[in-house]
Amino acid sequence: ANADRLGYRHDFTIYDASDSLSLIKSIIRELQLDDKTYKPSTVQAIISHAKNALIEPQAYARNRELIEMDTRSKRPLIHEIYRIYRQRCFVSGAMDFDDLLLQTNILLRDCPDVTARYQEQFKYILVDEYQDTNYAQYVIIRRLSQLHSKVCVVGDDAQSIYSFRGAKIENILSFKKDYPSAMVFKLEQNYRSTRTIVEAANSVIERNSKRMEKKCFSEGDMGEKIRVLRAYTDREEAEMVVSDLRDKVRAAGDEWAEAAILYRTNNQSQALEDALRRKGIPYRIYKGNSFYDHKEIKDLLAYICLLYTSPSPRDRG
């Protein structure tokens, strides 16, 4: 809606990350730039950061700090790639994901009637994971809430881990300043972790210079002492985890079904599976697929088996 106010068709196209990267690659080739210096994914990330900071191509080119930073990194033409990229997207009637935020801000900034309409439509605004919002999202929320100031946000400044994607911790830290009449409810009791873990987390986070004052606590068991294992590779880490698990299961006389390994990302499973297989430990993966059950891996293993088991011409003769 309202895309026509920005010069776009109402049925504009949305470029995903792959579409965006392809366009950036073609621009780098056209400008005859070295794609090792101007790595497309790096250029894409820089443009994304600029948009999330509401910096348009013209402003980027005039920003001495950004230009000096690009020059030091031997990429002085980032601003030109950004300008061409923005122009190509516009001519093609397309926006990428970051444009959806940037163009929304431009719309709310330049079209007061649109802003007034949406302020009435969205009198109450609820934002989850507020600590992960970027500057562009912050400004949208501020503009929409300017009339009624009825904003509820949920977040934890101690869990802000997406600054590399443009998240601004200042958004949640300045919430009371932005909305002076807002009430703050601190959820300080932890129902999941042992007291040892909560106290350790408190001792680390209290060293932050920029934080909201709170003291988390747990009424659960004290739990085991925290151990830190240092590993240099994912394979070494998996070996340490599996060896430790095996020793504990044997010492306690438990069944393997009573043991579990929790991991955060799916790509960690392969190293763990390999370590379990090497030690002959049976396992099942819950709510996910084994690395060796992926179709492409099964196909590849089948080809390898075929190569090893097929008789050679000499054997057939």
Predicted regions and their residues:
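Conserved P-loop NTPase-based nucleic-acid remodeling module centered on helicase motor cores
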Residues: 1-46, 55-59, 229, 243
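Single conserved hydrophobic/aromatic residue that forms the stacking wall/gate
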Residues: 308-317
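P-loop NTPase Walker
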Residues: 1-14, 21, 92, 115-116, ...
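Helicase P-loop NTPase motor core
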Residues: 180-183, 188-282, 295, 307
